[in-house]
Amino acid sequence: ISNLRMGKLDRSLLNFYGMFSYGQARNLYATQEHDHFITGKNDSWYYARQPHLHSTSELLRITNKMLIYEERNDICLAFGTPKAWLEDGKAIEVKNSQTCFGPVSYKIDSNVADNKMHVTVHHEANSSTPHVIKVKLRHPDGLPVTKVEVNGQPWTEFGQEVITLPAGQTDYDVNVYFK
């Protein structure tokens, strides 16, 4: 998670996929405390390698942080998503994720064949409001964001991959264009 927060996404993804490829019992699909490093044996029902609640919950926590996390007074969406998850025709959807600022839902629809993506965000405000909501969109071919529309209006608060949405609204309809 530290790598994700520091913007070192390649390292973060290496950790994420490493937990899947090495840290799971092949016949149980749950993480375990350890494997035998020399033989690679990972019999999931051996007393020291039983399903390990801490490791499994850590994998869930990392997945959650890849999709949504809070940084001080901001909500950050999709900051840890691999480019492959945003290939043409794919979608990412998060429903009612709990934050300090109330539940947040969002959906990203990729249409990168036409160099665009569509994002909807719903934030059920509670007594506290985030300063901003940031959405990170990593184009599979590395193309930068060139134009953004928020709720049908031109929007200028964006960088190469990150769109910064204003606080105080509950619904956002965002069209993002790449070139």
Predicted region positions:
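Non-catalytic C-terminal accessory modules of carbohydrate-active enzymes
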Residues: 2, 9-179
